[in-house]
Design a protein with these regions (language model features):
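Conserved redox-cofactor binding core of oxidoreductases
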Residues: 3-81, 86-104, 137-139, 144-161
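Glycine- and aromatic-enriched mobile tails/lids
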Residues: 6-24, 58, 63-65, 161-177, ...
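Glycine-rich loop(s) and the adjacent beta-strand/alpha-helix scaffold that form part
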Residues: 92-149, 286-299
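An anion/pyrophosphate-binding glycine-rich loop and adjacent beta-alpha core
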Residues: 125, 131-243, 299, 303-306
Length: 460
């Protein structure tokens, strides 16, 4: 990337900063990502890659045991059009997933999200063709400024403090661009906990930072895509050197929860690969995306050279998805996709919530699973769409429902409390499960859960 023109050494050397304990190794490389997308697209085009913008994929095709292609929808004009695609291999790279749980900042505004509001495309596509999913039962929550959701908390260089000025954690007492304040990484629910206990709010304090340090922080935020936040603060006269910035815990998202893949990015379905935050067994973030995108891309290309095209457009899965989405367009006065999405968020937030303040149980999860089935039944028969845009959103809601189904079933199968998965009927952490992954997947119409050793290769 550095050779291509992504500035990986903006200070002249490789610099790792943030998300680290004082005095311990820093693993996160800080670089200038402002031109990253432009550079990577340029390099991809240079080797012959073709881009089809405004063509979301809404279904995968499987012929025999292999992936054979996909169904895209051309949404470049007001009237959508189906575009079947034959493919020898497929690599999913749709990013993380928002809009599955009620928005913690602004419940009525679903798109106030800490990242790009991606919506479960990769996980939903993989789920429906039988790919195994892993770590779906563990809620991932991020944090950042209150009400205006923006992630990138490690780019803030200050100290988390109580209202009386006392540091919340023991790791930082002054602003530090090298380490930041790692308290919220260690104590994931800190911002929610201090509010629940009445000892909050929690503030990010940069009052002791130098002008040079603040200039660095603002530059780093620009490289991380936080320009809307910076613009808002400047417009409203919010100066972190003078004003404490309240932080909060955001709603659960699927970030490093999803498809179970091999070291080369291949899922349990031959010919189907995945890279990035929709992968469930490799961590998350840019490092995983870069590694699996590179390795998975090479592996997918090598495998494609050994197989023939198959008639993906003739498969039942493609036919059924075309019929379902067409029925939405035939029902322009039908229920709005937002109604279905918000109902899904309510079900997930009430029956499969994130701990530690809220709990799960067999009775809650079974009820949630039943309500989810009822919601899907109603949505498929009542949802309508008036144009390409609303059809795309309706398809996203169906993908989100698939993720909800995977989460409910995985949470039922993990009969213990671990991390933010808190079972009131199994309040302990089972040490015998510490070296195992729980995977779930569709086999026919049934959801099947299985345990596998963490270091065991992905099985088909």
């Amino acid at each position: 990337w550095d050779a291509w023109g992504v500035n990986m050494r903006p200070t002249g050397d490789w610099e790792c900063k943030g998300h680290a304990l004082p005095g311990k190794p820093r693993a996160f490389l800080k670089y200038d990502g402002s031109d990253q997308k432009k550079v990577l697209v340029r390099e991809a085009k240079a080797v012959g890659v073709k881009f089809y913008n405004h063509h979301p994929v809404v279904e995968l095709a499987r012929v025999g045991d292999r992936i054979a292609g996909a169904l895209a929808v051309d949404i470049s004009t007001e009237q959508p059009a189906f575009v079947p695609v034959r493919a020898k291999t497929v690599l999913l790279a749709t990013g993380l997933t928002h809009r599955l749980y009620m928005n913690a900042s602004t419940p009525g505004f679903m798109f106030n999200t800490g990242h790009c509001p991606n919506c479960a495309g990769g996980q939903g596509l993989g789920w429906r063709v039988g790919a195994r999913m892993v770590n779906m039962e563990f809620p991932y929550t991020h944090a950042g400024p209150k009400y205006l959701q923006r992630c990138g908390k490690a780019t803030w260089i200050g100290v988390y403090r109580y209202p009386d000025g006392k540091p919340i954690g023991p790791f930082a007492t002054k602003s530090d661009p090298q380490y930041g304040d790692v308290t919220s990484d260690i104590w994931n629910s800190v911002f929610e906990d201090v509010m629940r206990k009445g000892t909050g709010p929690a503030y990010m304090d940069c009052s002791d930072a130098t002008d040079e340090q603040m200039a660095y922080m603002r530059w780093a935020m620009t490289g991380e895509g936080l320009t809307a936040l910076l613009t808002y603060m400047e417009k409203e006269g919010i100066d972190p050197q003078k004003h404490g910035v309240e932080f909060m815990r955001y709603e659960p998202i699927l970030h490093g929860r999803g498809l179970d893949v091999s070291d080369e990015g291949e899922t349990s379905v031959p010919g189907l690969f995945a890279a990035g935050d929709l992968v469930g067994n490799g961590g998350c973030g840019i490092a995983l995306a870069a590694y699996l995108g590179w390795e998975g891309g090479m592996a997918a290309a090598a495998q494609a050279a050994t197989v023939d095209f198959q008639p993906a457009e003739e498969t039942e899965s493609i036919r059924k998805r075309m019929e379902l989405l067409s029925s939405f367009m035939d029902r322009p006065e039908g229920a709005d996709w937002k109604d279905a999405n918000m109902a899904l968020q309510q079900i997930m937030s009430d029956y499969a919530p994130a701990g530690p303040a809220k709990v799960r149980s067999e009775t809650l999860l079974n009820a949630g699973r039943d309500y989810l089935k009822q919601l899907r039944h109603s949505a498929e028969r009542q949802m309508g769409a008036t144009c390409s845009h609303t059809l795309m959103r309706a398809a996203e809601v169906l993908d989100l429902m698939d993720c909800g189904e995977a989460i409910m079933n995985a949470a039922l199968a993990r009969q213990e409390t671990r991390a933010n998965h808190v079972r009131s009927d199994f309040p302990f952490t089972n040490p015998l499960l510490a070296d195992k992954f729980l995977t779930v997947g569709l086999e026919g119409d049934e959801v099947v859960a299985r345990w596998r050793p963490i270091r065991q290769p992905v099985s088909r």
